[in-house]
Regions:
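Active-site core of glycosidic bond-cleaving carbohydrate-active enzymes
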Residues: 1-185
Length: 185
């Protein structure tokens, strides 16, 4: 079965649309999130039986995520920004490894000079994962980066909407791909 994973992440192999975060990890993370949201919706709707059912599915999915994507010493098996973002933002990081996961995300961010290299699955949650874990300054700095890759880089290039690719138009004027390069996402 094909999964798009962290689509158009900058940590992809050259010429690939698929980011470096394993699709098994992104699929499991979003499965857990979906179960959690279903449990919350059922609770709001007053359907206690479904709320309990989906809360149980979420608990099991979170346990499976930890077993599959954390080593015995608490390191994530995938050393990507997206892996750490999803684990933190979706509440899938075991408490005993939370600080280690936060620290590693900050290291991965620093390795990119404070820039993101995430795709469609990691990007929407990056600033929230940072700020919810006390990293307000890093979230603020990330959001306001004016150079490539970053949101304000796109704005300074004349963008009025978010581009499909971070490198839709590179600083040297070249494009990632003329065949698939939407400037309206």
């Amino acid at each position: 079965k094909m999964q798009l994973g962290d689509w158009v992440a900058l940590d992809a192999e050259p010429g690939s649309y698929f980011g470096a975060t394993p699709t098994a990890l992104t699929s499991q993370a979003y499965y857990a999130l979906s179960a959690q949201l279903l449990a919350l919706a059922a609770e709001v709707l007053g359907n206690r039986q479904d709320a309990e059912l989906y809360a149980g599915v979420h608990r099991q999915a979170a346990q499976d995520f930890a077993a599959n994507f954390f080593t015995l010493d608490g390191a994530m098996t995938a050393q990507t920004q997206t892996a750490h973002i999803l684990a933190l933002r979706f509440g899938l990081t075991p408490q005993k490894w939370k600080q280690k996961t936060i620290q590693r995300l900050l290291e991965l961010l620093e390795q990119q000079n404070g820039h993101l290299v995430t795709g469609f699955l990691g990007t929407p949650y990056f600033c929230a994962a940072l700020s919810q874990n006390g990293c307000w300054q890093q979230a603020y700095d990330l959001m306001l980066k004016k150079d490539y890759p970053g949101w304000l880089y796109q704005v300074l290039q004349g963008a009025t909407t978010v581009w499909e690719h971070w490198d839709g138009r590179r600083p040297d004027g070249t494009m990632w791909s003329a065949g698939m390069n939407s400037f309206n996402h």
